[in-house]
Amino acid sequence: MKNTCSTNWKHHPAKYELIGLMAYPIRHSLSPEMQNKALEKAGLPFTYMAFEVDNDSFPGAIEGLKALKMRGTGVSMPNKQLACEYVDELTPAAKLVGAINTIVNDDGYLRGYNTDGTGHIRAIKESGFDIKGKTMVLLGAGGASTAIGAQGAIEGLKEIKLFNRRDEFFDKALAFAQRVNENTDCVVTVTDLADQQAFAEALASDDILTNGTKVGMKPLENKSLVNDISLLHPGLLVTECVYNPHMTKLLQQAQQAGCKTIDGYGMLLWQGAEQFTLWTGKDFPLEYVKQVMGFGA
């Protein structure tokens, strides 16, 4: 487990608890900066550190979490689905997703949560958009994407049209769709992204387009899964999970097409706020973090 976050220990109290972030790659993440600013503002005896952890090293990292009596950890790519196998309890929403991004350690008993979905849907709601009865085109079938789909289904989306390449996630997408269809009133379909006609038809009729993939993230910042900007229309809300870079190519396309957009900072902020409360039991200093991180009003 490689620590990539430097820490000035003299500012910490004699007794503190450690919170981690386990992902690979990790250097792009704003979570350590955001969470540490929030912890400092709240005056809480915790520190948040990032560790480079991939699938191969994840089991050992979890043993380390227990041995060090860490309060918990964030979980990001590529570990979100694997992490489900290493916790003692999953929330109902996490079971529906099949992936987690948050682990809370209660004296060695690990609980798994997924705040990606609640964070992204909260960002949509905060923009004034009501998702109830709406339809969504969802790109990708990884942990973030399925979390958004599951939470959207729970909170009232009528239909989700999930598009994914026929890669290692495609069968997982089909299994996810089955779980949601069996447990919610939302209808989920899965289509190969190579079917561009189906993709175009979905965009023409749906209310929301959400990118839950890493396309648009460095080093793919010049890429977008929308090959033809004419597929986007002003009535479409386009939302993004990627926040580095802040303005992805997809968001640029959407703004050029007259769409309303929500950038990846919204999801980062709201999912992080929920994580903060799960780990500390305290309210997240939302307005302060918005200001110091430059996330806007």
Swiss-Prot record:
Entry keyword set: Amino-acid biosynthesis, Aromatic amino acid biosynthesis, NAD, NADP, Oxidoreductase
BP term (GO), one: shikimate metabolic process
Residues the record lists as binding substrate: 80, 116
Domain of life of the source: Bacteria
Catalytic reaction annotation: L-quinate + NAD(+) = 3-dehydroquinate + NADH + H(+); L-quinate + NADP(+) = 3-dehydroquinate + NADPH + H(+); shikimate + NADP(+) = 3-dehydroshikimate + NADPH + H(+); shikimate + NAD(+) = 3-dehydroshikimate + NADH + H(+)
Any GO MF annotation of the entry: quinate 3-dehydrogenase (NADP+) activity
TM annotation in the entry: none
CDD domains: NAD_bind_Shikimate_DH (cd01065)
UniProt binding sites for NAD(+): 141-144, 164-167, 214, 241-244, 264
Its EC number(s): 1.1.1.282
Family label: Belongs to the shikimate dehydrogenase family.
Purpose: The actual biological function of YdiB remains unclear, nor is it known whether 3-dehydroshikimate or quinate represents the natural substrate. Catalyzes the reversible NAD-dependent reduction of both 3-dehydroshikimate (DHSA) and 3-dehydroquinate to yield shikimate (SA) and quinate, respectively. It can use both NAD or NADP for catalysis, however it has higher catalytic efficiency with NAD.
Complex formation: Homodimer.
Protein name according to UniProt: Quinate/shikimate dehydrogenase
Species classification: Bacteria, Pseudomonadati, Pseudomonadota, Gammaproteobacteria, Enterobacterales
Gene name of the record: ydiB
